[in-house]
Amino acid sequence: MKKSIITVFLTLLLIIQSFAGENNGDKKYVLVIHGGAGAVSRDIPESLKQEYIDGLNQALLIGKSILTNGGSALDAVEKVVNYLEDHPSFNAGKGSVLTSDGTVEMDAAIMSGIDLSAGAVAGIKNVKNPISLARLVAEKTPHVLLIGEGAEKFADEMKVQKVDSTYFFIRAQNERWKELKKKISEDKKGTVGAVALDINGNLAAATSTGGMMMKRPGRVGDVPIIGAGTYANNKTCAVSATGWGEKFIKNNVAVSISKLMEYK
């Protein structure tokens, strides 16, 4: 069976940049990223559009630096997503959209294709970089998914950086929340992610999100559900999905792509 290097499944309108197939000596590495910035109009000012593009390009450079220097795919996807979580233009970390209560609840997941080890967190409110907490779940616990208060307590034990909730309340998201609150509407777009193949032939995937704007508090989408929105297997592919999370969960999209490749 011919091994496919990377498969990335995306839905809806996204800003997507990819840097793929470069050689480092005789060995190839691949990096593909996506950045979900909520309901972005096609008519946004050029200056704002450039912020998204510049952010994605910088994220690519971060991942490229790691991979060209022999770093692991897992390190690359984590650091790329760290950067996107810190960038206010994207729906993850600092730029996370708000729930119907006007609060932030973030989800993230990371997976290694080497041994299928995975970690995920959901309902995170005060961790600056949820993707790094997800990696600690994979590496420091026998579990795969931690949620809410338990995940926050684990973050304290691991001395993960936390921030006050006001860190996440950027003006653009607050204004959009007020607008949607009046309309009693929902926004089903968002999420940032990365998949990578390192020079040793190992795959990894990472995904982080603030979820959908105006979601009911406690709602968890596909991102932290391994096999739905995030998956990596060295035998097949690495997947970071974005779109309407409930659809990905119902159809187990990420692992289904992998299985189709495996059994073809």
Where do the protein language model's features map onto the residues?
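Alpha/propeptide regions of enzymes that mature by internal proteolysis
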Residues: 22-264
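Bacterial Sec-dependent N-terminal signal peptides
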Residues: 1-26
